[in-house]
Amino acid sequence: MPKDKLVITVSGLAGSGTTTLSKKIAEHYGLKHVYAGLIFRQMAKEKGMSLEEFQKYAELHPEIDREVDRRQIEAAKEGNVVIEGRLAGWMVKNADLKIWLDAPIRVRAERVAKREGISVEEAFMKIAEREMQNRKRYLNLYGIDINDLSIYDLIINTSKWSPEGVFAIVKAAIDHLDPVGDAGSKKEKEVG
């Protein structure tokens, strides 16, 4: 069984299932769920911008990303939390378990289209543009290549399992965590 003050990060690209998994983990283990995407969306709404507009705005205003990151790091210090966000694994230095979810872009586009009520083609284009913008922004701001998965403890292609199947895999990993494991040591570079 995992240690007290458990900290888990769940990262992945749009439509990979990070929110679904994070909610399941939080509910099952009684953890708080901190969602970087929601923080980002709330900030966009506060500025009266669409997500796409705010994405472009954030490229020119690094304080946006830094505020999202600061909130994630603060939540991790409190413990008993699942932190969901593309950079959560990079930002939370000593997470007990760092998870990356992936799926082919077509599968992710289908999921996003269903969730947002748009065509698969439109979702595909939005995802591709957003990922290009994010990758550039993370490289410029932190020197992080979002495609570098070397810091993650568990990488899952969510197109191969149902959400329940993905959770079962992650639950097994959490339930068998070594309480004196590496806690992310040596695997990651310093950020910010």
UniProtKB/Swiss-Prot annotation:
Q: Which Gene Ontology MF annotations are present?
A: ATP binding; CMP kinase activity; dCMP kinase activity
Name the Gene Ontology biological process terms: pyrimidine nucleotide metabolic process
* Residues that coordinate or bind ATP: G12, L13, A14, G15, S16, G17, T18, T19, T20
Which compartments does it reside in?
Cytoplasm
Keywords associated with the record: ATP-binding, Cytoplasm, Kinase, Nucleotide-binding, Transferase
Recorded catalytic activity of this chain's protein:
CMP + ATP = CDP + ADP; dCMP + ATP = dCDP + ADP
Q: Name one GO cellular component term.
A: cytoplasm
The EC number(s) this enzyme carries: 2.7.4.25
Cross-referenced HAMAP family, in alphabetical order? Cytidyl_kinase_type2 (MF_00239)
Name this protein carries in UniProt? Cytidylate kinase
Q: Which organism is this protein's natural source?
A: Pyrococcus horikoshii (strain ATCC 700860 / DSM 12428 / JCM 9974 / NBRC 100139 / OT-3)
